[in-house]
Design a protein with these regions (language model features):
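Edge beta-strand at a domain terminus
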Residues: 51, 113-126
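Short, solvent-exposed coil/turn segments at beta-strand boundaries
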Residues: 58-64, 83-86, 100-107, 125-126
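Sec-dependent N-terminal signal peptides
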Residues: 4-15
Length: 126
């Protein structure tokens, strides 16, 4: 009986932690630290690594995420294609940029005729 009560306590407390986690919402602001930034250049057929930066972005309305200007993203605005409890999916109007945020993991891919960029970062909600 004692073990059953202990097990029940742990199950209920795990549920309480999840219930208190905050869902993604309009006006949320995230600060991120890049872990990798690489670019494939089709003409040179080479992969180049770039300096990792910090950047910020916010969910400005139900349809838009905007990045601050002091980074590689320079006021980039992306459309929200999906927003869930802890997941955010983004894309550009032309479909050349796709980004995902799940928990604290952020990835963004940009594709053009000349090059493809890939960035990963760890993010924290402010």
């Amino acid at each position: 009986m004692k073990y059953l009560l202990i097990l029940l306590y742990f199950i209920l407390s795990a549920g309480a932690v999840n219930a208190n986690a905050k869902a993604l919402a309009v006006r949320d602001v995230f600060t991120c630290q890049m872990e990798a930034f690489v670019q494939w250049d089709w003409e040179k057929t080479e992969l180049t690594g770039y300096q990792k930066q910090q950047f910020k972005f916010s969910i400005t309305d139900e349809n838009t995420v905007k990045f601050e200007e002091a980074s590689y993203f320079e006021n980039l605005a992306l459309n929200i294609s999906y927003i869930g409890y802890k997941i955010l999916a983004l894309n550009s109007e032309d479909g050349n940029i796709v980004a995902k945020l799940k928990d604290d993991k952020f990835s963004i891919v940009a594709i053009s005729y000349d090059a493809s960029d890939f960035i990963t970062a760890k993010c924290e909600r402010l």
